[in-house]
Amino acid sequence: MEQPNTKPVAPATSRNAALFERAQKLIPGGVNSPVRAFKAVGGTPRFIQRAQGAYFWDADGQRYIDYIGSWGPMILGHGHPAVVEAVQKAVLEGFSYGAPTEREVELAEEIVKLVPSIEMVRLVSSGTEATMSVIRLARGATGRSKIIKFEGCYHGHSDALLVKAGSGLATFGSPTSAGVPPEVVQHTLVLEYNHIAQLEEAFSLHGRDIACLMIEPIAGNMNFVRASVPFIKRCRELCTQYDALLVFDEVMTGFRVALGGAQSVYAQSIPGFKPDITALGKVIGGGMPMAAFGGTRAVMEHLAPLGGVYQAGTLSGNPVATACGLATLREIQKPGFYDALGARTRSLVEGLTHAANQAGVPFCGDSEGGMFGFFLLGTLPQNYPQVMKTDSPTFNRFFHAMLDSGVYYAPALYEAGFVSAAHTAEDIEATVEAATRFFAGR
């Protein structure tokens, strides 16, 4: 196996540094998505030149074991032959038509087959577009205005969902981004994740005005925090009782943690469990701009052109993106795929935990399928305030030590990590060895 570089390039000769300097003159912050700027951890972002399998190479020619996987989509690894072949064939047939294609129908059929809660599905181009459209759909289908979200859950950057929790119970939201007028989020209730009593109180106060409850079943922007089974069960019960729609945001977890998504994991403990609407993204595009939302036929038929809820997109169902997504979904259905992926991911988390504990460093981790997270804490957190107690300075040092060893984790404390089918036992071993060196010498 080719070994990663372990000697950082001096800033004076680094192409990464030169590219970042050029980028900052033209692109706000030098990046096109804030987390890529390394602002949380410090240092110079790596500008990626190419990727293959479980690795990518930066502008200085250094190779890294990749645990961000384009923030989730690359479940097969980079450049999987079946996906590359499908995309090459699609490109030769045309980039975009602005008209329906057979592959749109085929991708919809695959999604409906694999996710039992989805009877109809609409394809869009990003996770933000999916969740934004879901909010409009839920309000249109119910005739209600209020929505519930949870502190620490990220549902994209649409105005109504960029909300932080205020103090006290079920506080009406205030924006967490400049440029979002307060009146836009006045109908957004923000509750504490995994807090059943607060959830019950919110429905008691506002139940008949709530259009939907939106939740990340595994919150990947709190690093990796699971909603407890009793909490999800109560979410379902209260939504049913008050005729509100239960929305699972599975943009990150869909097809990443299990073939049927996180909802299939909860259905193992809650008989008959289904959300009303599901938002999907990342894996269904295989690395191309692709997302979707789907649910019961009764709800989805409120969408135009059947109903009065308008949603549209020039590139929705793009023929190249659907080819990439279809090829990916067909690969992950092969026998044993998720068993092997889950075992490899668990071995990584177990190895990191052992390395830290041997050095007396508080550390805990969790995983499901090919998604994982870890905290510099003694016990797994259950909500955002607990996540905030993790040791940020130590994480930043850990991040840079691993980066210098050729291991690329998310450059932020609150982001989940991802393992692909291309990661090998040797990759995991090299990663754990690098972590062991850091913890022993901290």
Curated annotation (Swiss-Prot):
Record text on subunit structure and interactions: Homodimer.
Pfam families: Aminotran_3
An example Gene Ontology molecular-function term: transaminase activity
Disulphide connectivity of cysteines: none
Main location: cytoplasm
Family to which the UniProt record says this protein belongs: Belongs to the class-III pyridoxal-phosphate-dependent aminotransferase family. HemL subfamily.
Compartments (UniProt record): Cytoplasm
Protein name listed in UniProt: Glutamate-1-semialdehyde 2,1-aminomutase
EC number(s) on file: 5.4.3.8
GO biological process: protoporphyrinogen IX biosynthetic process
Entry-annotated residues carrying N6-(pyridoxal phosphate)lysine: K282
Biological source species: Polaromonas naphthalenivorans (strain CJ2)
Associated pathway: Porphyrin-containing compound metabolism; protoporphyrin-IX biosynthesis; 5-aminolevulinate from L-glutamyl-tRNA(Glu): step 2/2
GO cellular component assignments: cytoplasm
Catalytic activity line of the entry: (S)-4-amino-5-oxopentanoate = 5-aminolevulinate
Origin: domain of life: Bacteria
Cofactor(s) recorded in Swiss-Prot or TrEMBL: pyridoxal 5'-phosphate
Keyword vocabulary terms for this entry: Cytoplasm, Isomerase, Porphyrin biosynthesis, Pyridoxal phosphate
Alphabetized InterPro entries for the sequence: 4pyrrol_synth_GluAld_NH2Trfase (IPR004639), Aminotrans_3 (IPR005814), PyrdxlP-dep_Trfase (IPR015424), PyrdxlP-dep_Trfase_major (IPR015421), PyrdxlP-dep_Trfase_small (IPR015422)
